[in-house]
Amino acid sequence: MASLFWSYLPAIWLLLSQLLRESLAAELRGCGPRFGKHLLSYCPMPEKTFTTTPGGWLLESGRPTEMVSTSNNKDGQTLGTTSEFIPNLSPELKKPLSEGQPSLKKIILSRKKRSGRHRFDPFCCEVICDDGTSVKLCT
């Protein structure tokens, strides 16, 4: 009886994956015949699994995409921002590091203001169709 189950398991898996693939293709065809070209030009590596949202298909990767500076250049010296955790570091080196922190925060904040709410995510792409619907794909 168990061998019968294992022989049917690949067929069931193929049937279910085909049904999902056809339903996705039907939704993506609503964007027109040129959708594939746009998908290739915007997404180098699209993911194959999607979930539906009101704005279109979406897979949220949940990965944060924020660049964090790890060094501060003050008076020609490059100091790591994590150097305060080094036990044998002299107080002379720790002092310029603490003085440099406000300027480092100011640079990071100004970067965030310039980028606005639209961040470039190398793992996602969004294709907007002519009818106003959008498709967002994330790896």
UniProtKB/Swiss-Prot annotation:
Keyword Secreted: yes
Superkingdom per UniProt: Eukaryota
Keyword Signal: yes
Record's subcellular location: Secreted
Protein name: Early placenta insulin-like peptide
Record family assignment: Belongs to the insulin family.
Function: May play an important role in trophoblast development and in the regulation of bone formation.
Annotated disulfide bonds: 31-125, 43-138, 124-129
CC terms in the record's Gene Ontology section: extracellular region
Leader sequence residues: 1-25
